[in-house]
Design a protein with these regions (language model features):
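Short loop segments at secondary-structure junctions
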Residues: 63-64, 90-91, 145-148
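Short beta->alpha linker loops
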Residues: 21, 43, 64, 121-122
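Short amphipathic alpha-helix that is part of the acyltransferase structural core
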Residues: 2-43, 153-163
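Conserved active-site alpha-helix within GNAT-family acetyltransferase domains
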Residues: 110-146
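Conserved acetyl-CoA pyrophosphate-binding loop and the N-cap/start of the following alpha-helix
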Residues: 91-100
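A conserved beta-strand-loop-helix scaffold within acyl/acetyltransferase catalytic domains
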Residues: 43-86
């Protein structure tokens, strides 16, 4: 259930960040996740759409063109997970990912949580600026991964065929 009470927008130097789901360019988001990201290669558009429906989404736009994205999966009470963060290559190097994280962490509905988490292979220095650290007590965390997903670039195509 999407708990958004209202659409919010932020402007900076010709760019806009918006929580308006109606503005999301699903083909752009899907293309990046399924074809350019290391974490979601091959992910079906239906899976991306379902994830968007159950997240607080932050679209990054230059004019009307979507150039970046992030989403937060949360219970709006104690826990938030930042996922699927990206800025298209031609818009990188302008501080947009930093601005996106500033906006997310300042969002009024995302305050007072006990814990924020995320996973990254290559952007540790970005997230450290915002107080993210390696898991404090990793021995307390567990995961239940799909054994077929681990490092399998065809995972999402396989899931799609078997459903």
């Amino acid at each position: 259930m999407n708990m958004q009470d209202q659409v919010r927008e932020w402007q900076r130097g010709g760019y806009t960040i918006s929580t308006d789901d109606a503005r999301l360019d699903i083909p752009t988001i899907h293309d990046f996740i399924a074809n350019q990201s290391y974490w979601g290669r091959g992910r079906a558009v239906e899976v991306v759409q379902r994830a968007l429906e159950h997240s607080l989404n932050f679209g990054l736009y230059h004019g009307k063109q979507q150039v970046g994205f992030a989403r937060v999966v949360t219970d709006y009470a104690t826990f938030a997970w930042v996922a699927d963060v990206f800025v298209l290559a031609e818009h990188r190097g302008r501080g947009l990912s930093k601005w996106l994280m500033e906006v997310i962490l300042a969002h009024p509905q995302l305050q007072g949580f006990r814990r924020w988490v995320l996973a990254t292979k290559d952007a540790h220095s970005l997230y450290e600026r915002f107080g993210f650290i390696p898991l404090h007590r990793p021995e307390r965390w567990m995961e239940r991964p799909d054994p077929n997903m681990q490092e399998n670039p065809d995972y999402w195509r396989t899931v799609r065929r078997n459903r």
